[in-house]
């Protein structure tokens, strides 16, 4: 199916822009529960449909561009309305039936009702929308390339992290409804790698059979809070983590016997203790219950030992494409040095070490840096070294000691680059710069500053999370002279 142009902001009319001016009189008379027909113009950054009711921007979860829906107001805000679909009078040609019955209830499935080619078009447009909003230098001329998708946009997630609770006397494992602590049990999940769900559901059945105490959030009682299952795609090894309210895990030995007998792919069983009521999933203490403390993953010829807390990209198939895009964009020569900022466990920098003279990386999390250096050693890479610290502190120190990087790759969190780091990048002025972004909005904001010293060659979006509204991109820069 061709990518529909109604997923592009460029197809919006001037009238459409005028509709963004709120009509305060109308807004004052809108009530929760009020219904009205609404034509959906485009998708917002969270995948929600956007229409205009008497000039007031209205966000309708689950609605798609070109649809005519009957919307019911769920919230009235000073500058916008929120609504839900009561009925669809005219469906989008891109609307499909989601595979997961709970897709509209929990996060992570916000685009599952949208045909996949249209999802890819939307993600390319997300970048254009962000550029239009923040207007970095020359943005109208940027080469924003079509999103690289997946042949099969399902069964890609290598980790399932499900909350565990009792529902009607039965053990349930799944995700919370959006903006609540109401758990939705997930017996199946189309975006998870199948083996992760096989292990998850079998363990849930055993917890019920053995009557292991399940955590009760309201009374802060019970024991098992969360189950985490991670699969190493290259080796098939699986790690299972029980996150518990206490160090004690009743029926532990019976559980471990069943796992060893029935789930041979589980080679690592861990327990993480996270006591009391807290919004954090993980506690500080992790112990080995059975097997080995890590699982072994491979990526483009490199081997990584993943501990329970170690970060690794959730989509192994697309990660290979992502890192090849970074390699292609940097186009390193054998005599060039590379800085890997926000290095995590070193996956990006180590994947480039074979084409660089030297790789230096940094991260603020000591455990990640320890993993990065261990991964370098594990792969017999001698020209890569990682340090604990902030890039904006370490970069000037390295420059002062005579290390001037020829190239830099940055892979920041969703909050984007720190302003001090941007200044450090502009001061150190590496000839080559590649930015791996997981948030178009903060990318566009960072481009406002980075374009003082660099020009944008292209922005290549890549779909790391099909069926969601999340968008990643690789940006290549050339230094201004």
UniProtKB/Swiss-Prot annotation:
* PROSITE patterns reported for this sequence: SAM_MT_RNA_M5U, TRAM, TRMA_1
The yes or no answer to whether the keyword Transferase is present is yes
Region annotation (Disordered) ranges: 1-28
Recorded GO molecular functions are: rRNA (uridine-C5-)-methyltransferase activity
The yes or no answer to whether the keyword Thylakoid is present is no
Active site, renumbered: 438 (nucleophile)
State the family it belongs to. Answer: Belongs to the class I-like SAM-binding methyltransferase superfamily. RNA M5U methyltransferase family.
Protein's name according to its UniProt entry: Uncharacterized RNA methyltransferase lp_3226
Task: Give the organism, scientific name.
Answer: Lactiplantibacillus plantarum (strain ATCC BAA-793 / NCIMB 8826 / WCFS1)
